[in-house]
Regions:
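Alpha-helical transmembrane segments within multi-pass membrane transporters and channels
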Residues: 45-85
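Transmembrane alpha-helices
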Residues: 158, 163-187, 200, 204
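Transmembrane alpha-helical segments in multi-pass inner-membrane proteins
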Residues: 179, 190-227
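Transmembrane helix-bundle core of multi-pass membrane transporters
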Residues: 73, 77-140, 167-170, 189-198
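Structural signature of hydrophobic alpha-helical transmembrane segments
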Residues: 1-7, 48-58, 124, 196-206
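Hydrophobic side-chain positions within alpha-helical transmembrane segments
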Residues: 37, 61, 65-69, 181, ...
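Membrane-helix/interface signature in polytopic inner-membrane proteins
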Residues: 133-173
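Single transmembrane alpha-helix segments in multi-pass membrane proteins
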Residues: 1-47, 68-75, 207-224
């Protein structure tokens, strides 16, 4: 359950981007970079709050860069996010020097990814809460409904006065936030960060989870609960 929950966070972040008609090849690499930054922050003695904040900021920045490349510079989402993936991979290798970052005893930080509340893994509780929040935002708020509208039929959305730029940017940044937090959780779960930089295994599994999850409703609509 704990290992699956970590992957589910990455899949949730990717699903948010897909809902608005985007695509994010950088999802796994960004999470892996956030994992390394979180591990390095803990090794430096900055504490769990700093690790969480840095992970979230990393994801937000990556989302903003992806949005800028797609919406301002007009690059295809696949190409833009592939470029960000390679940048994140390079940044990870530069940061960790190709070496695993292993944490010593950090009981408070380790609780995020490994702790239990009764018989239930704490990370599973975090996953359920995050899923509920995202479901509410995407299905019960104007922001979320317009993200769906842009993703499902851009022409119809624009005829109704719903511009693509604002809601596609929101999807990249919200998805990036979740991906950054996923990286922090992964650092907690795995006692640090591995020397790997690609995160490609996370990306493939997350894509599979998102698209298979769309089969849970008759419309074949992407949704965080299905993911």
């Amino acid at each position: 359950l704990k290992q699956g929950s970590v992957l589910a966070f990455i899949a949730l972040g990717l699903t948010v981007v897909l809902i608005a008609g985007g695509f994010d090849m950088s999802a796994g690499a960004v999470s892996q970079f956030a994992t390394n930054l979180a591990a390095g922050t803990m090794i430096a003695g900055a504490g769990s709050a700093a690790a969480l904040g840095l992970g979230a900021l990393t994801g937000l920045i990556a989302g903003a860069v992806n949005a800028a490349l797609v919406l301002i510079f007009g690059m295809p989402a696949f190409v833009a996010t592939l470029g960000v993936m390679f940048v994140a991979m390079g940044a990870t290798l530069l940061y960790n020097g190709g070496q695993a970052l292993t944490l010593a005893d950090q009981s408070g930080f380790f609780f995020i990814g490994q702790g239990y509340i009764g018989p239930v893994p704490f990370v599973l509780i975090l996953l359920l809460v995050t899923t509920a929040i995202l479901h509410f935002v995407l299905k019960r708020t104007r922001l979320g409904l317009r993200m769906y509208a842009v993703g499902q039929d851009l022409v119809a959305a624009e005829l109704r006065g719903i511009g693509r730029a604002r809601y596609a940017t929101a999807s990249f940044m919200l998805g990036g936030l979740v991906l950054g937090l996923a990286g922090v959780i992964l650092a907690s779960y795995s006692y640090g960060a591995s020397a790997l930089a690609t995160g490609i295994d996370f990306l493939i599994s997350a894509l599979a989870a998102a698209f298979l999850g769309s089969t849970l409703n008759k419309a074949g609509e992407l949704n965080v609960i299905g993911t």
